[in-house]
Amino acid sequence: MKSINIIGCGRVGKTLGRAWHSSNFYRVQDVLTRSLASAEQAVTFMGAGRATNSLADLRPADVWMLAVPDGQIAQTAVALAQAAASWAKSDRPNPGGPPAIAFHCSGALASTELAPLRSLGWQLASAHCLLSFADPGTALQQLEGSPCALEGDPSATLALEPAFDRIGTRCFPLAAEHKLLYHAGAVFATNFLPVLQDLAQQLWRDSGVPADMAARLNTTLLRNAVDNILALGPVCALTGPAARGDTALVQRQGEAVAQWNPTAGKAYQALSQLAAKLAAS
């Protein structure tokens, strides 16, 4: 069984680490986070691995997962490459072995963020599961059937695909130059949805709708909209004043929302324009 070291073990790292441990695909070895306490919590959740908060403590591994925030991927790769170079000069073996695979979990950034590790002969990739990792325990139950975008060196993606297949995801290839737009699609599909739901609930609350009825409104409309989109597609599922060309109501309603919250008013106008364009398509 191949070993994996995990650097940065938040919600994504913990979910994937536990899934691979439970499925006996990877042997979770070392788990590195900024805080030893958080590393220990991650190890406890995964049921495997050794917690550390020092690069110098990391041991050789076949696979390295950098599950750190996007803004920290490049600097983490630099630090790891520097540490690996110093290890290679000492009595310790190269921590990745020849050749190791290193991948990060960003949906927006390409595997080129890991470029410093290429000097070690490592193969590089990125792997992005299209799943909301709001809670690792819940995410574990949702991995089955979820899509996973793989990008990077062919040898690395070829080796990673069986790992993600084992935990139930469905992999597909993605070109590095398309990652930003691809991830923006995911942001529109899921990340903005809670924002829109929160705005709707605020509007209902400030309109005097009782809390229990607002919750019922939210549940009914959300389920109805999702069901229609999945069954009919976005164009046929679209309803509302912009979709039916009621520009007068869109204007009046937009002004009312802008008075209530200027930023929400701008969002209303922008989304209404997009809705009208979609309806006309």
Sequence positions of predicted segments:
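Internal alpha-helical scaffold of NAD(P)-dependent oxidoreductase catalytic cores
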Residues: 38-45, 121, 138-230, 278-279
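Short, well-ordered alpha-helices that flank and scaffold nucleotide-derived cofactor binding pockets
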Residues: 14, 18-22, 44, 78, ...
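Short coil/turn segments
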Residues: 9, 106, 152-155
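NAD(P)+-binding Rossmann beta1-loop-alpha1 motif at the extreme N-terminus of oxidoreductases
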Residues: 1-54
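NAD(P)-dependent Rossmann-like dehydrogenase/reductase catalytic/cofactor-binding core
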Residues: 215-281
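Short, hydrophobic beta-strand segments that form beta-sheet elements in well-ordered domains
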Residues: 29-33, 102-105, 150-151, 275
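Rossmann-like NAD(P)(H) cofactor-binding subdomain of soluble oxidoreductases
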Residues: 36, 45-138
